[in-house]
Amino acid sequence: MYPVDLHMHTVASTHAYSTLSDYIAEAKRKGIKLFAITDHGPDMEDAPHHWHFINMRIWPRLVDGVGILRGIEANIKNINGEIDCSGKMFDSLDLIIAGFHEPVFAPHDKETNTQAMIATIASGKVHIISHPGNPKYPVEVKAIAQAAAKHHVALEINNSSFLHSRKGSEDNCRAVAAAVRDAGGWVALGSDSHTAFTLGDFTECRKILDAVNFPEDRILNVSPQRLLAFLESRGMAPVPEFAEL
């Protein structure tokens, strides 16, 4: 449906089951042009060591015509918006996603969750907030969407939230999509794949977007060029190899 997927996990996050090579093969099969590997930040119990992220610099940029972005799904750690990505990790990464995960930041009341998420958005360190519609972490959706639009941060619609994880996310995600639409911000679609078989599956995301008449021109996944322009506007250096995507 879209040629870009921005959220997936490899065997480096040990509750996932596919390798980088598996994802490349599946991307070729499905016509995915660009994807981001976003294993969990090191504060999660089964996450890779921070060296894993630093060493992503050895990855090729293109394999058989498929572009690979070096990313992380970092953890929001506290109400100050600190994340478990720092120092040399930033130097090796193209894409920083951050979100709430219970082993790192336990669910709080709506005010506290909102404060932590807005602080993360405003930090300038994050490109995308993952699964902001998680019902375990209620937030002030309009305030989050307005902050994200102001700071040029995308809010994710996460396909896995409607299938395997975060049950009860539908109403919240419709509210997120509508609030982003009204604020003039961006959404990012993520399969949140933990196995390569679901790479590029945005079927449930599309239902959410259609329900609120979300504009296609505010979806980052529409083309590699749109996503790369967004990242470059946030400071990522152009990647010459991606010019052919």
Swiss-Prot record:
Its EC number is 3.1.3.-. One of its GO terms (cellular component) is cytosol. NCBIfam families: PRK09248.1. Coiled coil: none annotated. GO terms for biological process: bacterial-type flagellum-dependent swarming motility. Homotrimer. Binds 3 Zn(2+) ions per subunit. Zn(2+) 1 binds at residues 7, 9, 73, 192. HAMAP family: YcdX_phosphat (MF_01561). Keywords: Hydrolase, Metal-binding, Zinc. This is Probable phosphatase YcdX. InterPro entries: Phosphatase_YcdX_put, PHP_dom, PHP_phosphatase, Pol/His_phosphatase_N, Pol/histidinol_Pase-like.
